[in-house]
Amino acid sequence: IDATSAITLEVNKFNRIIDSYSKTEKGTNMLNELKVDNSAIDISIKSILEYELNNDMIPENGIIITVTGSQLKYDALEKTEEFIEEQKIQVRFNNSGDEHKVSP
């Protein structure tokens, strides 16, 4: 997840986060507060975006969410996509090379 602080989430085949980290102090603090490890990817990304929105961590040009490795299933981020649309956040989603906009 690339915003003002880049976040890396490692996900298992059950779409649960097995590791999360950031190279920035702000990103690390956010992950420590949210405790996303061992949680569902959809809920975790939504929580991260909500935190970033509430803490002015979303750049004007929006956020990029990039998936490497196996693609996520089409409906894997249903709650996240609803939140993005409700909040009108600009998000580009690259699902292992298949890029599309999620935002309105």
Regions found by a protein language model. Give the residues of each.
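Polar, acidic low-complexity tracts enriched in Ser/Thr/Gln/Glu with frequent Gly/Pro and Thr-Pro motifs
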Residues: 1-104
